[in-house]
């Protein structure tokens, strides 16, 4: 490839990635892949993480896509985002809309079983034990009103 020839959008796992960024940064554009996971994927694909994604040849992009697809089989169980799935019991790494739908299903399951966390989700309150007396208030502020003379 010439120096000027660059693909501005690279399609990986049904997501358009920014071709002007480094590989390890561009991969974080896929929901479910963070900085640590993207570094691991570039190592599995044998691609320089600091290379510009749009300048890579199709074979390298294919290796990256293959590493993303086979990520679960190549890393330990503690490195995936869905360990011991509630329904199937398997270890999976969810990406994109699958991750969003599974999170919504988990919240709905907690609501249906009326667990403490489910009730907090239902009422729109904080779920993870944060303080609620002074922070997280919604609505308009009243402020200080003067007394009528």
Curated annotation (Swiss-Prot):
Q: GO annotations under biological process?
A: translation
Q: Name one GO cellular component term.
A: small ribosomal subunit
Q: Which SUPFAM superfamilies match?
A: S13-like H2TH domain
> GO terms for molecular function, please?
rRNA binding; structural constituent of ribosome
For bias type Low complexity, the affected ranges are 132-143
> Entry's InterPro entries?
Rbsml_uS13_C, Ribosomal_uS13, Ribosomal_uS13-like_H2TH, Ribosomal_uS13_archaeal, Ribosomal_uS13_CS
- UniProt keyword annotation of Mitochondrion present: no
Q: Which family does the similarity line name?
A: Belongs to the universal ribosomal protein uS13 family.
Role this protein plays: Located at the top of the head of the 30S subunit, it contacts several helices of the 16S rRNA. In the 70S ribosome it contacts the 23S rRNA (bridge B1a) and protein L5 of the 50S subunit (bridge B1b), connecting the 2 subunits; these bridges are implicated in subunit movement.
Q: What is this protein called?
A: Small ribosomal subunit protein uS13
Species this protein is from: Methanoculleus marisnigri (strain ATCC 35101 / DSM 1498 / JR1)
